Amino acid sequence: MTAWILLPVSLSAFSITGIWTVYAMAVMNRHVCPVENWSYNESCSPDPAEQGGPKSCCTLDDVPLISKCGTYPPESCLFSLIGNMGAVMVALICLLRYGQLLEQSRHSWINTTALITGCTNAAGLVVVGNFQVDHAKSLHYIGTGVAFTAGLLFVCLHCVLFYHGATTPLDMAMAYLRSVLAVIAFITLVLSGVFFLHESSQLQHGAALCEWVFVLDILIFYGTFSYEFGTISSDTLVAALQPAPGRACKSSGSSSTSTHLNCAPESIAMI
């Protein structure tokens, strides 16, 4: 077991705690309305007697979308920090998992595509975290679309990769868990997108709830990589960073420890 096992758990714990903290700050600073509020008005008049605490009068501008929660300071500062640090951790997890599969002689187009989608997800998170929706709407929406779509593709591809590599009952149980998480992610992302396109306050609020479920679901999925990361070594990162054509392979008579790859053609699994 290595310290790398803490990386996926840290990503999940840090990000989930962070975005809920951002939400709590936004509610207390009256920048969004609570998720339990389903009543929205066309407009609200300022009430001088209403000091602190959640809003009692809400408009569509107060729907608690995750991005909306991180629009205004001070919560926007924490939101950007979460986006940037989360992106680095996501990219590192994707790279390590890619290298780990290469060590297992599982160099396939699915593994390569999963790496690309994971890194694309990380890039989208950087854009989302640093370009707030009220100040750079187009860039923020592009970043959100890229991050969410790439994140969904990443979890689906890794469901396939893990299922085909499962050998024990515990592996199969983890494969089923990840499949359930992938299905939940797909359903909530589709519903969030459909609801968001409508101007109905109820559907907009539903879009916000689906978005929260989607993001939490994806973060939990990333956390499950701790199951595999106990076997990661320093050679894993080397395997991931080596270019494909010149990847060194360990022969039976060689003392090289650059990778754990087996070069026998018949041992290379294509999925």
Swiss-Prot record:
Signal peptide as annotated in the record: none
Subunit structure: Interacts (via C-terminal cytoplasmic tail) with PI4KA.
Localization in the cell: Cell membrane
Protein name (Swiss-Prot/TrEMBL): Transmembrane protein 150A
All ranges on the Cytoplasmic side of the membrane: 1-2, 97-108, 162-178, 233-271
Summary of the function given for this chain in its UniProt record: Regulates localization of phosphatidylinositol 4-kinase (PI4K) to the plasma membrane, possibly by reducing the association of TTC7 (TTC7A or TTC7B) with the PI4K complex. Acts as a regulator of phosphatidylinositol 4-phosphate (PtdIns(4)P) synthesis. May also play a role in fasting-induced catabolism.
UniProt KW keywords: Cell membrane, Glycoprotein, Membrane, Transmembrane, Transmembrane helix
Membrane side Extracellular: residue ranges: 24-75, 130-140, 200-211
Gene Ontology CC annotations of this record: plasma membrane
Entry's family note: Belongs to the DRAM/TMEM150 family.
Transmembrane region(s): 3-23, 76-96, 109-129, 141-161, 179-199, 212-232
Membrane topology: Multi-pass membrane protein
Residues with attached carbohydrate: 37, 41
Species of origin: Mus musculus
